[in-house]
Swiss-Prot record:
Residues 21-117 are annotated as: Disordered. This is Envelope glycoprotein B. GO terms for cellular component: host cell endosome membrane; host cell Golgi membrane; host cell plasma membrane; membrane; viral envelope; virion membrane. Residues 21-30 have a biased composition (Low complexity). It is found in: Virion membrane; Host cell membrane; Host endosome membrane; Host Golgi apparatus membrane.
């Protein structure tokens, strides 16, 4: 049976102690000073008990007296001290010196005294040793009725580990969610038919019909890409009826393509018409107008696996494969339209409408007509334009380990573990997977040259494995340069592949590998493998070490059982037994426990009847239960009571022994009991081997995503936000939304006059321009006045002006009437005022008599000259305002005439006083 290393060392120590009985050792566990003090204390006790020469004088024939541990009264004569203290369950931390007859024992160093640090330490040591078994065991000699044997060595397990650990370079591939993207061009004519009701001052749409018509192949090739022109008519079929729309309801003619308004994030576009035809005419008449806008719009197209259709950025679906054509077997691709709706042009030179030039290199151009538009795109073969797999991560250090029927690829850089089968995955099974081998070889070659070119060798070719979760792993095994022989073995394994198997793999139908959107399972697998590897290696090493240790210790057990069979049998059977060798087996008998208080030790190991011979183990007296008679025996090993007292040896000088007695030890010196010790008083040498377990190392996880947000966004064919954005920007790019056409009732008249004069030829056009200009000016003036009067603020202003004019006319009329009645009073109101109020000193008649006729004539002349001066100043002022030369000359001529007219009657100054007259 398996035992611990500590038990084995205990057996070895027991063997050493047995060997020491034949050659007594002079060593002890205490220092010289302590042994000296103990020896002095012991000698004082011996002197009090009449022990001489260190040998107790015990009559050989005298029977053993009654055993007791209580102190005996002093004796008058010398008696042999035959009793040692009784083994008890007292705390071993307080050892007692045996009380001899007639002697009061001295207090020992461990006696109860006031608080002392040494005593506290002793008590603690006593508590530590109190857990040992204090019982004694009586083991009868085995008779052979029960025999046992030791088990044979067991086979030890192997460490759980992976097989064929291989390092290498790996490139992981995932499912390609991104659709195939290419540039396409839409050709169509936007047809708008509007029905307008014209009122006198307003227009009202009665109906607006909008439609899209595809452009024929010939017009696209010859006119649009040939000359950058487009026809003004649109011929298309609706409800199985062929119809034709004419731009501006005029005859067919060519229109030039002009660039559309640019918008951020959109491709280029061209069209022919910015303003739509809105028919207007005389009031209260229904009119209809047609607009045809030829549009060439570059858009982005997308197609996803299996590439049977594609969708344009406008949201329009085309139910044909982008790889359909008439070259290289592409006619087998899907096409849901009739044959006459598709045309493939070889050697086509497309026109760049931005620069007006045609491309220098020819292309194969596909044209497909749908009911609403014609779409064109550059044809390309399906292989290698698309690939169902795309490269995910490059792993320079990938470890491959074989676990059972699977490979586990572990990468610390990714913190992930991928599980695959042991068999390789053929690339021929991947539909449209040509890019996998090419990209894998390029990445592996680059990593190998950068990192492993001088230290490792490649083992065979690149291997491919399909991992759980839909990841395809391209793995290149590597070997260090000193393992070239393994490289040769790997080459032999590669060459051992049967040709039939290779042919079978090459003809396997291809399929698409579906990859999960999350890699958390690989992260969990990596975590589990990381913990499993650490735990399994730790416990595996422990199991192997434990097994090997048991097998090695079994040899020691077989040898130790020959020396002390009882100890080996007791430890093995986990109970106290007595054993002896019967050939190659152990005969055992069960030991009976004896309470410690029923065991008494004698304090002398000398044999009185045989001088020079002593017992090698102390003598005991015991009884199984209280009330029975005492039985004699000898202390054996490990508290065993031997019923025979046959353990003797020649007496030697300087004898010192420690014997396990109950829960402590007893010390004999010169074959005489000295004192008792606790187990804690003896320094223990530990045989325990510490188990050094390595703690689990820390590992940080890094974020790892299979598909980015942009890849997930691009995985769908239709982007609702992009479609709505493009459709709402269509009106801004291909129409003028800022120009406003208002209702004009005279537009019909002008249109009729314009048509009339246009029919008269060049002369009619010239006359028509003059007539239309004059009529337009008159109409504009009348319209302006009419619109001003129709405005409430204008009418209010006119009313205020009229009212102000009436008030001014009234005051002017009054002034004129005053001038007619009394000009002087009107002109000189202050002068005439004195005439109405004469001076207080004179009467009226006398005043009238003061007027002189000559002075009156002079007054009349003065008034006349004042009128002339006023007229000259007005003429000069008007000439200055006009600022012209003719006006200035006219003013001067007028001045000369005025001066000449007034030359005869010269003006003379009036005298200052009446006396001067």
């Amino acid at each position: 049976m398996a035992i611990s290393r500590r038990s084995l060392h205990a057996i070895i120590l027991t063997v050493l102690l047995l060997a020491a009985t034949a050659a007594p050792s002079q060593s002890g566990s205490r220092s010289r000073s302590r042994r000296k003090s103990e020896r002095q204390s012991t000698n004082r006790g011996r002197d009090n008990n009449s022990i001489r020469g260190g040998v107790a004088q015990t009559p050989e024939s005298s029977p053993l007296p009654a055993l007791d541990l209580t102190p005996q009264p002093p004796m008058e004569k010398e008696e042999p001290d035959t009793l040692a203290p009784r083994a008890s369950r007292d705390a071993p931390g307080t050892p007692k010196v045996p009380a001899m007859p007639g002697v009061t024992p001295e207090p020992s160093g461990n006696a109860s005294e006031p608080a002392d640090p040494a005593e506290l330490r002793a008590d603690l040591r006593g508590l530590k040793g109190s857990s040992d078994d204090p019982n004694f065991y009586v083991c009868p000699p085995p008779t052979g009725a029960t025999v046992v044997r030791l088990e044979e060595p067991r086979p030890c397990p192997e460490l759980p580990k992976g097989l064929n650990f291989t390092e290498g370079i790996a490139v992981t591939f995932k499912e390609n969610l991104a659709p195939y993207k290419f540039k396409a061009t839409m050709y169509y004519k936007a047809v708008t038919v509007a029905s307008v009701w014209s009122g006198y001052s307003y227009n009202q749409f009665m109906n607006i019909f909008e439609d899209r018509a595809p452009i024929p192949f010939e017009e696209i090739v010859d006119r649009i890409h040939g000359r950058g022109m487009c026809l003004s008519t649109a011929k298309y079929v609706r409800n199985n009826l062929e119809t034709t729309a004419f731009h501006n309801d005029a005859d067919e003619h060519e229109m030039k393509l002009v660039p559309a308004e640019s918008a951020p994030g959109l491709h280029r576009g061209w069209h022919t018409t910015r303003l739509k035809n809105n028919p207007t005419g005389s009031a209260w008449i229904h009119r209809h107008g047609t607009t045809v806008d030829c549009i060439v719009d570059e858009v982005e197209a997308k197609s996803s696996y299996p590439y049977n259709e594609f969708v344009l950025a406008t949201g329009d679906f085309v139910y044909a494969s982008p790889f359909f054509g008439y070259r290289d077997g592409s006619h087998s691709e899907h096409n849901a339209y009739a044959a006459d709706r598709f045309k493939q042009v070889d050697g086509f030179f497309p026109r760049d409408f931005g620069t007006g030039r045609r491309h220098g290199s020819p292309v194969t151009y596909n044209l497909l007509t749908t009911p609403m538009f014609t779409v064109g795109w550059n044809w390309a073969p399906k292989r290698p334009s698309v690939c169902t797999m795309t490269k995910w991560r490059e792993v320079p250090e990938m470890l491959r380990a074989e676990y059972g029927s699977s490979f586990r690829f572990t990468s610390n850089a990714l913190s992930a573990t991928f599980t695959t089968n042991l068999t390789q995955y053929s690339l021929s099974r991947v539909d449209l997977g040509d890019c996998v081998g090419k990209e894998a070889r390029e990445a592996i070659d680059r990593i190998y040259l950068e990192k492993y070119n001088n230290t490792h060798l490649r083992v065979g070719s690149v291997q491919y494995y399909l991992a759980t979760g839909g990841f395809l792993i391209a793995y290149q095994p590597l070997l260090s340069n000193n393992l070239a022989d393994l490289y040769v073995k790997e080459l032999m394994r590669e060459q051992a592949l049967k040709p039939e198997e290779r042919k079978l793999n090459a003809t396997t139908d291809g399929k698409v590998i579906t990859t999960t959107s999350s890699v958390e399972f690989a992260r969990l697998q990596f975590t589990y493998n990381h913990i499993q590897k650490h735990v399994n290696e730790m416990f595996g090493r422990m199991a192997v070490s434990w097994c090997e240790l048991q097998n090695q210790e079994l040899t020691l057990w077989n040898e130790a059982k020959k020396i002390n069979p009882s100890a080996i049998a007791s430890v093995t059977l986990h109970r106290r037994v007595s054993a002896c060798m019967l050939g190659d087996v152990l005969a055992i008998s069960t030991c009976v426990a004896v309470p410690a208080e029923n065991v008494i030790m004698q304090n002398s190991m000398r044999i009185p009847s045989k001088p020079g011979t002593c017992y090698s183990r102390p003598l005991l007296s015991f009884k199984h239960v209280d009330g029975e008679e005492l039985m004699e025996g000898q202390l054996g090993e490990n508290n065993e009571i031997r019923l025979d007292r046959d353990a003797v040896e020649p007496c030697s000088v300087g004898h010192k022994r420690y014997f396990l007695f109950g829960a402590g030890y007893v010390y004999f010196e010169e074959y005489t009991y000295s004192h008792q010790l606790s187990r804690s008083d003896i320094t223990a040498v530990s045989t325990f081997i510490d188990l050094n377990i390595t703690m689990l190392e820390d590992h940080e996880f890094v974020p790892l995503e299979v598909y980015t947000r942009q890849e997930i966004k691009d995985s769908g064919l239709l982007d609702y936000a992009e479609v709505q954005r493009r459709n709402q920007l269509h009106a801004l790019r291909f129409a003028d939304i800022d120009t406003v056409i208002k209702a004009d009732p005279n537009a019909a008249i002008f249109a009729g006059l314009h048509g009339f004069f246009e029919g008269l030829g060049d002369v009619g056009r010239a006359v028509g321009r003059v007539v239309l200009g004059v009529v337009g000016g008159v109409v504009a003036t009348v319209s302006g006045v009419s619109s001003f009067l129709s405005n409430p603020f204008g009418a209010l202003a006119i009313g205020l002006l009229v009212l102000g004019g009436l008030v001014a006319a009234f005051f002017a009329f009054r002034y004129v009437m005053r001038l007619q009645r009394n000009p002087m009073k009107a002109l000189y109101p202050l002068t005439t005022k004195d005439l109405k109020h004469p001076s207080e000193g004179g009467g009226g008649e006398e005043a009238m008599e003061d007027f002189d006729e000559q002075k009156l004539d002079e007054a009349r002349s003065m008034i006349k000259y004042m009128a002339l001066v006023s007229a000259m100043e007005r003429t000069k002022h008007k000439a200055g305002r006009r600022g012209g030369t003719s006006a200035i000359l006219n003013a001067r001529l007028t001045d000369m005439v005025m001066r000449k007219r007034g030359a005869k009657p010269k003006y003379e100054a009036l005298p200052e006083t009446d006396e001067d007259i």
